[in-house]
Structure formats: structure tokens, C-alpha cells
């Protein structure tokens, strides 16, 4: 990241560790090893597993609109532990209420050094607590009129299913998140900075996540 306000990690096998997993690692470390408490603020496109971990520790997870300015405002005005967004911007209350990728990397290194465990081992321990999951995203470039048509269909709840995946509920904090089953969901949202329609998904495995994204893409482009 050009100005180092975001963080990305790779494990020992060279596999990318996304921001959703980094946020979970930071929450666990700050609570269990640093004794820090407070609310966790995350953007609408972050994994819902964050709430599961917060529930485990008896702390609150508040979901904000997408954009770190919304998270920053909440962290300043309320007692906070951490704020994070899907794009890798994370802040912790023991530092400043603003994104700092270098600081987050140092905290993760400290976590690994103190426990003597690898990233994979630490992530597996979190999976043992809240269940495994995978997140992914498609960025679909399309004409503006097609993008607006899809968003209008979301507004009027036209999408009842995406292929074999039946919609059981909808959340509309910032975009349209369609709840599926077993902690799975898919979210449709126009980019605020590029001529794109972003489609996010969460499921138990990477393969299932891609299957949901493919089914959603086929449905909205039909």
C-alpha cells in the first residue's frame, strides 16, 4: 500500500491472509494477551465471524457504512478496542484511531513471537472457536445503466435466490447483503470510487465462496 495505512499478510506457504483474518487475530491478541476491552467497529463488507468472536469475549461489534471515516468517528466518540475495514485498513485503541499498516504488522509479529506459533496455527485456533470461513470478492465492470438496473432489482427485493442458494434475509446498511444459510451471505454494492459493481461472499470454504459468487454473477447478469 502506497502510504502504508493498510496491511496484507502472507503465511509460511506464501498464501495470502486477508484483512478479515487479521482483524480476528488482533481482537484475540488484544483481549487475551493485552487485557484490552471495548467495542469493535467494522465496515459492512467485513466477515460476520467478527461478531461471533466478539460475542465469545462479551464485547460488542458495531457495523458501519463502508469508508474508514465512519469507523474513525465511532472510535473517537466511544470506548473502542479496534476498527477495521475489508480493504485492510485497521486501527487499534492502544495506538491512534486511524489506519496504520506498519503498526498492525508489528502487533501480529509480537503475537507470533510471544506465542511461538505461526499464522496458520493462530488462525486455526480461531477457527476452533468460531468455525472456519472464507471471503472473496468479484469486481464486475459494466455500463452504468446496467449497474443501476441491478441495484434497482436489489431495492425491490427481486432476487429471491442465486442459483441453488436461497435468500433468507437482507441487510441494507451500505449495499445489499443477502443472507443465505450456515453463516453464508452474498453482498452487492456499487463502488464509490470506480465504475464497478462489487460482489462479496462469505462461506465455510473457499470453494463454496467462489460457487456463491459465480451463481450470483450468473443471476444478476442474466
Functional labels for PLM-detected ranges:
Residues 1-2, 189:
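Short beta-strand segments
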Residues 2-6, 88:
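Short, glycine/acidic-enriched loop or turn micro-motifs at the edges of active sites
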Residues 5-25, 50-51:
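Short Gly/Thr/Asp-enriched flexible loops that form oxyanion-binding sites at enzyme active sites
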Residues 12-13, 36-202, 206-222:
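Phosphate-binding and adjacent anionic-ligand microenvironments
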Residues 16-37, 65-67:
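Short, acidic/small-residue loops that bind anionic groups at enzyme active sites
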